[in-house]
Amino acid sequence: MASLNSALRTAQHVRTATRGALLWGYEQKLAREVKANGKLPRHLGLILDGNRRFARAAGLQREMGHSFGADKAHEVLQWCLELGIPSATIWVLSTDNGSREPAELAHILSLLEREARQLAVDPRIHANRVRVRAIGQHDNFPPQVLAALNNLEESTAGYEGMRLNIAVGYGGREEIVDAVQSYLRTQAAQGATLEQAAENLTPDAIGAHLYAADQPDPDFIIRTSGEIRLSGFMLWQSVYSEYYFCDVYWPGFRRVDFLRALRDFQGRDRRFGK
């Protein structure tokens, strides 16, 4: 019996190793195809969904799901750098998430502070001259979180490499409201009346006051977890974005899933409403 169990374990190890080797080979093939095609998003949007469900499926505390999700964000940043994607926005925390249980929200904000401090000294950020910006409404964040985000932004402010936007306290409708308010304040500072401000209002005028106005609109947006909805992510900018919905939870998002999504994007014909 012992020898039979040993043989079964050996066979299982062989099957696992074989599957791993096949997946690795497939991943390398995908990477070559994506690189050879050369058509990559100028601005990639990532909706990081499924942290809590990942933890629940694995029998873990939900806080662990957020921790694994933070680790995955570091991996995906590396994949973007390897491919030379110019700009990426990752949606970490929505305005609606602010209504979650205090203990969970405190854990997420603590993670955000930790990750911001780590990114500020991450050799990859400085070697690749990645400019990092936190976008969203942060007025209600704890002072130590705000300090960490401000330090990260200041330490990369002069860089002209990849642009990385971390959307925290972010909502698409709130962004549009903020943009309109900013536009009106600018018009008032220039001495315009309300009637003149209304006459001057155009889509481009609002676009100039969005959080990432100096970057191209996202041309490709990936959402994990199998949920097929937009949830207000970059509402104004995503009018012509291509979407890809991936069935895996964010912490389980693999490089092969990332490459499959990009290959799908490369096969699409973007018509921009025409």
From Swiss-Prot:
Residues annotated as binding substrate: 50-54, 62, 66, 94-96, 100, 223, 229-231
Entry EC no(s): 2.5.1.-
GO terms (BP aspect): polyprenol biosynthetic process
Active-site feature positions: 49, 97
Listed GO MF terms: magnesium ion binding; prenyltransferase activity
Pfam families the UniProt entry points to: Prenyltransf
The protein's name: Isoprenyl transferase
The organism of origin for this protein: Deinococcus radiodurans (strain ATCC 13939 / DSM 20539 / JCM 16871 / CCUG 27074 / LMG 4051 / NBRC 15346 / NCIMB 9279 / VKM B-1422 / R1)
